[in-house]
Amino acid sequence: MPDPMRSYLDFEKPVAELDSKVDELRAMAAAGTDIGEEVSRIEEKAGQALADLYANLTPWQKTMVARHPQRPHFTDFVNGLITEFTPLAGDRKFGEDAALLGGFGRFRGEPICVMGQEKGATTESRLKHNFGMARPEGYRKAVRLMEMAERFGIPVLSLVDSAGAYPGIGAEERGQAEAIARSTDACLSLGVPNVAIITGEGMSGGAIALTTANRVLMLEHAIYSVISPEAASSILWRDGTKAQEAANSMKITAQDMLRFGVVDTILKEPVGGAHRDPAAMIAATGEAIAQAFDELKGLDADAIRKQRRQKFIDIGRKLS
């Protein structure tokens, strides 16, 4: 059987079958049968099938990969990259929102403010973090963090992975749109360098609120859009079953975003997606973060703001 701890996506069925065959052969080898060469041959075939599959993913397949439950989340990146992390809670206005986490720590010895959506990895944690869909309190907490970071001259890192801001009645009554707008404005107005990374889903204003940064990075199989494919399908076709068609038409992939100038860099994922080797993905992300902040060293507050604003003004003007 394939690795019981690994969740295969629908389009990965050929790879799952090969992995299952490898496991069967290994069991036979463990029982004393000399089939080492056959195991190696099937393993090589499975690896090549996986590489070929992921080299030609459709936008809808990338959407499925971006949502993979075993993909590294905010807490994984923080645990792997940030030392002495001290989380802050609450927006000082209404309460705490566990969907958007943030605090201060050190990245390679230097102070850093880090924040982002946490989807959760288990049923219990997903409910606790509301599947990464932040309420107004989360975005106001983000503003609070950014204000503190600017006060102390600390750079800001955002890790974005959300299906969007929470659309519940309570959230709307407490000013969801205003909170998103203020968070977006706070990002644009920062006098310290900020770097944003879209690690999975970057949907709607809930993502934009944290990604108006000097440098925007995106994982190879992440997606970024003003709306989810399912919602676009319901609006455009009045049919929620056309999500795959919508995704293939919306230009939501990292490659699309790079061509449009929306993101600056694509971070290559391990073969088979970040969920197959989270440790390698986190390490590569750390290198990219270090390079992005290094490129912004030496800029004063005015230059930082000017570069950031011009970056967003220029989006879409030059298509490669």
Swiss-Prot record:
Q: What InterPro entries would the database entry show?
A: Acetyl_CoA_COase_a_su, ClpP/crotonase-like_dom_sf, COA_CT_C
Question: Where, per UniProt, does this protein localize?
Answer: Cytoplasm
Query: Listed GO cellular component terms?
Result: acetyl-CoA carboxylase complex
The alphabetical list of record keywords is: ATP-binding, Cytoplasm, Fatty acid biosynthesis, Fatty acid metabolism, Lipid biosynthesis, Lipid metabolism, Nucleotide-binding, Transferase
- Segments spanning the bilayer are none
Which reaction is this enzyme known to catalyze?
Answer: N(6)-carboxybiotinyl-L-lysyl-[protein] + acetyl-CoA = N(6)-biotinyl-L-lysyl-[protein] + malonyl-CoA
- The enzyme's first-digit EC class, named in words, is transferase
Please give the function described in this protein's UniProt entry.
Answer: Component of the acetyl coenzyme A carboxylase (ACC) complex. First, biotin carboxylase catalyzes the carboxylation of biotin on its carrier protein (BCCP) and then the CO(2) group is transferred by the carboxyltransferase to acetyl-CoA to form malonyl-CoA.
- Assigned protein family: Belongs to the AccA family.
Q: Which HAMAP family match?
A: AcetylCoA_CT_alpha (MF_00823)
Q: What is the protein's name according to its record?
A: Acetyl-coenzyme A carboxylase carboxyl transferase subunit alpha
Organism of this sequence: Bradyrhizobium sp. (strain BTAi1 / ATCC BAA-1182)
This protein's encoding gene: accA
